[in-house]
């Protein structure tokens, strides 16, 4: 009897350990983008006109400060890295801590909301 109980506990633990973390919700990220980001940034079709900040179409994988149609602050212009989902998360959590001197005034403190916005941004291609 004890063997069956232990086997059941072990199997349950294995299932829990192998269950992937829930994926970010790009559709929710689009809603958040439209409400929080689209005032300053362009995203996908219908997300807003932006214009005060760089276009975020194709931002994942793009050089930091790499939108040729935007005049970045020096800290972003001088950056050599490319935007990844991790670097975007760090930046959006606290832009001025991540890159002191940035003009980005808004942060996204909620981890799930930030992940959703980044999932949405990752879905956008530069040509959209």
Predicted features along the sequence, with ranges:
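N-terminal signal peptide c-region/cleavage motif recognized by signal peptidases
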Residues: 18-19, 24
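Acidic/polar helix N-cap motif
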Residues: 25, 110-113
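Thiol/disulfide oxidoreductase modules built on the thioredoxin-like
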Residues: 102-110
